[in-house]
Amino acid sequence: PDANTLVWIAYLKGQSRELKTGEYRFRKGITALEILEQVMAGRVVEYPLTIAEGWTFKQTLEALAAAPKLTHILQGLKPKQIMASLGYPTMHPEGRFYPDTYYYSAGMSDLIILQRAFQKMEKVLEEEWNGRQGDLPIKTRDEALTLASIVEKETGKAEERALIAGVFVRRLRIGMKLQTDPTVIYGIGDRFNGNLTVKDLRTPSAYNTYVIKGLPPT
């Protein structure tokens, strides 16, 4: 049946106002009434988009921009403008979006996906913070997120993270420098060519944990 037939059937059944627009996929041999039921229920085609662990904010935006079925409203916006769209104009975006696979329908905006990832991270972070050990040398949720991001960059193996986190916590307790390469690389940014030099490790920076004590700002 074509679209006009479906609308007419819905009209006869008094349900024309319940039809929901969107992209649908129907199996071969489906009946008109089954199609009508699916359209009324709004069971549209959904597409996956994955935000991987360890991704930078730039990589997350690139994944959103590469999703052809999304409506792209974030392109051309600066990170601060994007965070303002989420209601947090002064918040740094790095590490604020929970790594997971999110599903969207055709025409949905990229901002909605970002909102979902942000809200999920906020929820998880709040739960983890409320259940933390009382004697940790970490004062805020943001510091906890920063430490978790550093640990994640140090190893891709989940079974090693607790051990590495323990090393960093002990260093923080005694006022020792963290001395971790990922923070230095992050501070170098796009200038990093894949090789970390002695000069890089000695160059003062808010992110150079071979120079500063404590955690970097983000």
What are these regions (language model features)?
Residues P1-L125:
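Signal peptide-directed extracytoplasmic domains
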Residues P68-T71, M83-T218:
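Bacterial extracytoplasmic/cell-wall-associated proteins, especially those involved in peptidoglycan
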